[in-house]
Amino acid sequence: MTEQRPLTIALVAGETSGDILGAGLIRALKERVPNARFVGVAGPRMQAEGCEAWYEIEELAVMGIVEVLGRLRRLLHIHADLTKRFGELKPDVFVGIDAPDFNITLEGNLKKQGIKTIHYVSPSVWAWRQKRVFKIGRATDLVLAFLPFEKAFYDKYNVPCRFIGHTMADAMPLDPDKNAARDVLGIPHDTHCLALLPGSRGAEVEMLSADFLKTAQLLRQTYPDLEIVVPLVNAKRREQFERIKAEVAPDLSVHLLDGMGREAMVASDAALLASGTAALECMLAKCPMVVGYRMKPFTFWLAKLLVKTDYVSLPNLLAGRELVKELLQEECEPQKLAAALLPLLANGKTSHAMHDTFRELHQQIRCNADEQAAQAVLELAQ
């Protein structure tokens, strides 16, 4: 940033979630520096905030080995072109938003050219492939982390990291309105309600749906009024779930929802879900939960070798203890899942204590992440 040139921030977002984060960051930066310039790889939300898109976000949003191999030449071209053009532009700061396989190498290239670099959203280095922390440390001037235990991990390796809180925690109220959510979904206020979330990936839905449905059947024996809501991320997952339900629980009445996972969590007395971001969202919705997860035996064996954490779900990692019951592999079966969910549906001491801890954890990570990220960028730009 000079008197002649406005503050110039380069950004690369690799998928929709990164576009949302990038838009929030740009908005917060514009409030402080109205004439700042933003350039890079951007989606529609970032562009709406004024980011000049050299490439569209879809160019980088590829998943799976086959897809990546099919697009490898194009990805390498974009990577080389961005290295060259950012090197010529000399932005005040480069911010790589998520997409670590693409961005961390790019950050390293730019840092060698004297450009200050930030990686926004820590990869799960604290959980597996921990040696990546050294590459990240070489490539970046600063990591922006959503969760406090991530910062503690980077501190251990003397990699500069700033805990900024989680944008999802900012977006969700500390005290969600259960009855309002039930009104939206058409669920009576005075019944018990269970949310089933068997995952967003096809393999997860295939592995978990049958056991989740059988668990719901067992629970309905105790709670005949039990309303069961099943939010599914898209039409493909819905068709898959309906096929499995027709095979294992054709007579079980459920409410299938197109999306609306957050509303389902807020409306429910308890949730049974696959691990992942859904567990964090469920915690923020203040919905007591059980995590059930199964994968192919070899994959699980490999994961046990590679994963270095005591827990798989984010609520437990945040709490540093088994706050939420995790039933994995052979433990993930209807009798055990139902036994873990029964006390939560009773709305007694167990669920109230879990709710209170969820609220405390929500407050810990509710830090206005967009503002915190913008402040970090401006401090580095000085």
Swiss-Prot record:
Name of the top EC class for this enzyme: transferase
Catalytic activity, EC: 2.4.1.182
InterPro entries named in the record: Glyco_trans_19
Pfam families linked: LpxB (PF02684)
GO BP terms, alphabetized: lipid A biosynthetic process
An example Gene Ontology molecular-function term: phospholipid binding
Recorded metabolic or biological pathway in which this protein acts: Glycolipid biosynthesis; lipid IV(A) biosynthesis; lipid IV(A) from (3R)-3-hydroxytetradecanoyl-[acyl-carrier-protein] and UDP-N-acetyl-alpha-D-glucosamine: step 5/6
Catalytic function, reaction form: 2-N,3-O-bis[(3R)-3-hydroxytetradecanoyl]-alpha-D-glucosaminyl 1-phosphate + UDP-2-N,3-O-bis[(3R)-3-hydroxytetradecanoyl]-alpha-D-glucosamine = lipid A disaccharide (E. coli) + UDP + H(+); a lipid X + a UDP-2-N,3-O-bis[(3R)-3-hydroxyacyl]-alpha-D-glucosamine = a lipid A disaccharide + UDP + H(+)
Domain of life: Bacteria
Any GO CC annotation of this UniProt entry: membrane
Family: Belongs to the LpxB family.
Functional description taken from the UniProt entry: Condensation of UDP-2,3-diacylglucosamine and 2,3-diacylglucosamine-1-phosphate to form lipid A disaccharide, a precursor of lipid A, a phosphorylated glycolipid that anchors the lipopolysaccharide to the outer membrane of the cell.
PANTHER family, per the entry: LIPID-A-DISACCHARIDE SYNTHASE, LIPID-A-DISACCHARIDE SYNTHASE, MITOCHONDRIAL-RELATED
UniProt name for this protein: Lipid-A-disaccharide synthase
Organism of origin: Shigella dysenteriae serotype 1 (strain Sd197)
